[in-house]
Amino acid sequence: MRKIIVGTRKSNLALTQTEWVIDQLKKAGVKNEFEIKKIVTKGDQILDVTLSKVGGKGLFVKEIEKAMFDKEIDLAVHSMKDMPAVIPEGLTISSIPEREDHRDAYLAKDNILLQDLPEGAIVGTSSLRRGAQILAERPDLTIKWIRGNIETRIRKLQEEDYDAIILAVSGLKRVGLSEELITEYLEPEVCVPAVGQGALAIESREDDEELTNIVKKIHDAYTAKTVSAERTFLHLLEGGCQVPIGGYAYLDGDEVVLTALVGDPDGTTILKETVRGTEPTEVGKEAAELLISQGAKEIVDRVKEEMDQ
């Protein structure tokens, strides 16, 4: 029986997610032996600038995908929100397990609510999407970029001049940090999450049928359907996770309901639409067309241009 080598980033969160996937596969009856191989990605190496300035798609996946092409690893576990809208030829997202919490978490010193933060208070985030939506809600706040893993960011909130930070709820839960740290859960009505937030992507070589059949055991149809709508929208706007784009879908009966967002980083323009329909890719396409007709493409292109300077 073959040994399966799983590639992942070396952060605590990435390792925890990978161990969770292996655990789920074993619970599903997979008897193979697994080995985890830690891989350093470009996004992990560059910590002194904002992610959006680093630019490029696949900041956290390219090196891992190369290891897969080179057959150093058999499969990879990624955060879905790190996945570019287009997967390299020869590779495929072979399984999408059940999604963890999709929401953003707002953590504040002294648990001060977002609406009660004083004027000029500093909110830490490395995401233009989060920054744009916070500024749309509270233009009097100051957004300051913050990098590092979850534990580092929480420490920075406690020790540095941040009044609050925004993190993904799923990340906090996965690394086992107490949800008591969370001051407020930001529902999609307040802050539309990143496309695929809370979901994982298991990526493998397209021609490896044996492995595809193994990882399909933990594939979740509900998550796959909703993520498909979100990622279709992302693909049509040609946005990576470093652009102020958000998308969250859920199922209502047999309909997919997608809320899609594109915003100016300063929060002055927020384009947001909710679309529903039975076919996930059609829903994603309709949302993209609606926002493009309102000027979303111009915002995305302008942000990309500013990043390249």
UniProtKB/Swiss-Prot annotation:
Keyword Ribosomal protein: no
Modified residues (S-(dipyrrolylmethanemethyl)cysteine): C241
Enzyme class label: transferase
Gene Ontology annotations for the cellular component aspect, listed alphabetically: cytoplasm
An individual GO BP term: protoporphyrinogen IX biosynthetic process
Catalytic reactions of this protein: 4 porphobilinogen + H2O = hydroxymethylbilane + 4 NH4(+)
UniProt xrefs under Gene3D superfamilies: Periplasmic binding protein-like II, Porphobilinogen deaminase, C-terminal domain
Free-text cofactor note: Binds 1 dipyrromethane group covalently.
Record bears the keyword Transferase: yes
EC number in record: 2.5.1.61
Needed cofactors: dipyrromethane
Annotated pathway: Porphyrin-containing compound metabolism; protoporphyrin-IX biosynthesis; coproporphyrinogen-III from 5-aminolevulinate: step 2/4
An example molecular function term from Gene Ontology annotations: hydroxymethylbilane synthase activity
Superkingdom per UniProt: Bacteria
Record key words, sorted: Porphyrin biosynthesis, Transferase
Listed HAMAP family: Porphobil_deam
Record text on subunit structure and interactions: Monomer.
Note: The porphobilinogen subunits are added to the dipyrromethane group.
Function: Tetrapolymerization of the monopyrrole PBG into the hydroxymethylbilane pre-uroporphyrinogen in several discrete steps.
Family per record: Belongs to the HMBS family.
Name this polypeptide is given: Porphobilinogen deaminase
Species: Oceanobacillus iheyensis (strain DSM 14371 / CIP 107618 / JCM 11309 / KCTC 3954 / HTE831)
